[in-house]
Amino acid sequence: MSFGSPGGRSVNIKPKPPERGSFPLDHDGECKFIISSYLQCLKKGGGVNDETCRKLAKSYLSCRMDHNLMAPECFENLGLVFDEDKKKREEASASTTAASESKKPST
């Protein structure tokens, strides 16, 4: 009795890389304290990923990016933008716009 494809041939299946590139393990435990805090937060919340836990996830990913364990990525693309982040971005763009308008020569 043979198993597999007809004719008894073995089929080679090539593994596919992750969609966003490699995600190396944190062997040195550089970000371990943050991920343990995140997991405790999830446990306290009964598995609900509320804003407090999401902020911990953001700091974990930021730590991974800082230690070159993950390619730098905009948090907006990762779905980790919060109200205070939006306010800071709006204030920064408003001050940049005001500064550029003050530099314009008046006619």
Curated annotation (Swiss-Prot):
GO cellular component: mitochondrial intermembrane space
GO biological process, one term: mitochondrial cytochrome c oxidase assembly
InterPro entries per the UniProt record, alphabetical: COX19
Sorted UniProt keywords: Cytoplasm, Disulfide bond, Mitochondrion
Domain CHCH per the UniProt entry, residue ranges: 28-71
Motif (Cx9C motif 2): 53-63
Disordered: annotated span: 1-22, 87-107
Superkingdom as given in the UniProt entry: Eukaryota
Cx9C motif 1, short sequence motif: residues: 31-41
Disulphide bonds in the chain: 31-63, 41-53
Subcellular location: Cytoplasm; Mitochondrion intermembrane space
Function text: Required for the assembly of mitochondrial cytochrome c oxidase.
Entries under PANTHER family matching the protein: CYTOCHROME C OXIDASE ASSEMBLY PROTEIN COX19
Similarity comment: family membership: Belongs to the COX19 family.
Protein name: Cytochrome c oxidase assembly protein COX19
Organism encoding this protein: Paracoccidioides brasiliensis
Gene that this polypeptide is encoded by: COX19
